[in-house]
């Protein structure tokens, strides 16, 4: 049995404390494979030991891989956040949500630890005694801005070796000759004055001193002109023009006192992408993108909370390593309860207040105070789980109040929408980044052909998956198509499985058999000449077999929330079920003509992939055999160990996990699963929406939406008064009384 391995280490429910804490799963070799946190350890951990079919597929894989479980009790949820992140960083568990940066971003670096600070552009953030400003979206824009600013603030940009060589020879570098360096190496400028130039350059680059400094230069220019110092006025004019160009590259989108991080979010069943805009002093000072694979069946609120913990833990650790939260753990035997203590960043908060006071007093940007890693405000498209705890934790990191909220209107809402759009585009790029490469795609198809013993590469691959609720309700299937290893969404199909009695197939194997039978009886299986399959051939081929009906429902082009094309194999939304008697005046129901136009199934695939192991493969092979299809290869990809199964073979084929062929099969399988579960949830949602409101006369769909949006549920409506109903737009007194009476009669 697949679930037996969990019984080897399943703790007694009474032994698990009903307290907040963090837990670790380990595999047979003692490696940590997953770290999680919970408000109530007992409730959370017992969920992992429920029947496997109730768990998310990847959670199934995780618990079947695990061989031990341990947990740590903490005092508060805030401590669990810190400890969970510490363990994730320490152990790098394979099943944990890890937000990956899709590229390295450029930063403006200032070597604050040197007596003569240096300014340069870098993509690494590992040097000690160095402050980093950014990230910036485009390196060429950063270099261009720095080049312009060096004419106004001629600071050192050379490496340590070049600087020491100039000191020994007494000859500065070329930048000093063209006015882009003040040559501190040969004492043309004092160290304190050079440091002040660095502070001013950083202040302009970060948006703190851009406009104020330009205003000061403008006043100086006018004074010089009034005193007839025209050469000085001309130099100041040129500096102002250069600074204006740099400042305009970072448009002011808010008031200058606005410091905020604005996040956008996009996700599907398998992956999520996040995009962030960094707003400092009213200007967009940078942007960044992360992507993550969904490991557990967690919602967007939990994903957003995990993102904020990871992003700001990294930022705070990079900028304040000396005052990062200290965690001491007393680790005992596996399965025992443990305690932790955490210290907050009081010293860092005091230092932040002192820097802010000093900057307000002097009017200068403090070189030792880079862009705050934690802003005053965080704008998110989805309110994160444990928002209040996160705000408290971020307040400690920042040394000042931090607010997390969802923008609903105004400029911040518009910027959040832009971030959402960027996240959506990044999600699509991430999904196709490897498979879209021609070389990788060719290698992937060749790997699959070699592993399965095919004569040629499978140019067209179809994959099938079954999705249903416990008990077989809302049973559906999906068919996804990959041509040249690229998803062809216009060929996607989805099937509503009905069965002989209209109640669905008896199990997943029967559902898979029905789906494939239906697909290939609608496809070009009677020969390329396009002849029909009559009723006698159909009955003969299906005699004694599982011949329940499958209605193949397709997606109209531009008519679904996934943006996927598709068409209807029958032209009416459903195929004609086998065995349904039509009117005698209509065409015989059991005759299926070969169709070649785009509204029907296309040509046969080279390879059929099913989501599952040997039983699923045998069911698929049987369906193809009964349909007279003998030139299409079949294989299955089992989730647990990613084994490839083929018909009539007692042992699986093992493909290297890092091979392009394995990646292609996984991509096809996961896409089919996503497509199936999306349709299943859509069907389930439609069924759940049929509520008590359907029985009330005069309350149509539009009124139902208004009522549900206002009250949230039918249960809340039953607790409402007539006056409460009248507050809903369009509901008068008479209709409110009818609603009240109808809901209380039921």
Curated annotation (Swiss-Prot):
Task: Print the keywords alphabetically.
Answer: Cytoplasm, DNA damage, DNA excision, DNA repair, Excision nuclease, SOS response
Q: Which residues form the GIY-YIG domain?
A: 18-97
Q: Which GO terms describe its biological process?
A: nucleotide-excision repair; SOS response
Q: What does this protein do?
A: The UvrABC repair system catalyzes the recognition and processing of DNA lesions. UvrC both incises the 5' and 3' sides of the lesion. The N-terminal half is responsible for the 3' incision and the C-terminal half is responsible for the 5' incision.
Question: What family classification does the UniProt entry report for this protein?
Answer: Belongs to the UvrC family.
PANTHER family hit by this protein: UVRABC SYSTEM PROTEIN C, UVRC/OXIDOREDUCTASE
Identification of the protein by name:
UvrABC system protein C
- Which organism's genome codes for this protein? Bifidobacterium longum (strain NCC 2705)
